[in-house]
Amino acid sequence: MTNKGRAGTGPAPCPCGNGAYDTCCGRFHRGEASPPTAEALMRSRYSAYVLGDVSWLRQTWHASTCPPDLSADPGTNWLGLTVKSHAQQDATHATVEFVARYKVGGRAHRLHELSRFVFESREPGEASRWLYVDGDLREPA
């Protein structure tokens, strides 16, 4: 993603909706920083889906639950993210409830999930960091 918005009007917005990409999720995707909270990680993962950054998705998915194929549907058009809640259970466990809106083939959809995260190393010898474990889909309200 470039650092300019439309017609050079300023920094490109972050897909997660929380600021400029370069200073929001971009710094995580480039490896300049690690997301400090489960919510920041979840936002960075949403942005990775929007941008097709499969490498970031794999790096931030817990090894015990990461599927072998993370290829995205190229026909998916992500429209926006709303974080409904972020709860810290203890120092190493958190949940984030969110709604992601998207279109496939012109039809609008919503992904409403309560995601679980752990703070640990993905590989032996790595520093601990937030990792996505799994989530429960929520029914539309």
Curated annotation (Swiss-Prot):
Paired cysteines (S-S):
none
Q: Kindly give the InterPro entries that the UniProt entry links to this protein.
A: NTF2-like_dom_sf (IPR032710), UPF0225 (IPR023006), YchJ-like_M (IPR048469)
Which ranges does the record mark as transmembrane? none
Highest taxon in the source lineage: Bacteria
A Pfam family reported for this protein in Swiss-Prot or TrEMBL: YchJ_M-like
Question: SUPFAM superfamilies this protein is in?
Answer: NTF2-like (SSF54427)
Q: Which Gene3D superfamilies match?
A: 3.10.450.50
Question: Which family is this sequence assigned to?
Answer: Belongs to the UPF0225 family.
Query: What is this protein's record name?
Result: UPF0225 protein Rmet_0111
Please name the source species. Answer: Cupriavidus metallidurans (strain ATCC 43123 / DSM 2839 / NBRC 102507 / CH34)
